[in-house]
C-alpha cells in the first residue's frame, strides 16, 4: 500500500513511502532504506539506497 508522504518524508523517501516498513521508510531491494533514500522509493526489487 503506497501513500503520499509528508514534506519531511518526501525529502527522505522520495515520491512514495510504503506502509508496514520500519519507521515508514522506503524499501530498497527488499530492505528498509536506513541511509539516504531509495532511488525509486517504491519498494521495487531493483531499487537501491542512495547516499544521504
Swiss-Prot record:
What span is annotated as the signal peptide, if there is one?
none
From the Swiss-Prot or TrEMBL record, state where the protein is found: Secreted
Q: Which UniProt keywords apply?
A: Cell adhesion, Secreted
Give the GO biological process terms. Answer: cell adhesion; regulation of blood coagulation
Give a Pfam family name: Ornatin
What this protein is reported to do is described as:
Potent inhibitor of fibrinogen interaction with platelet receptors expressed on glycoprotein IIb-IIIa complex. May prevent blood from clotting during either feeding and/or storage of ingested blood.
Q: What's the protein name? A: Ornatin-C
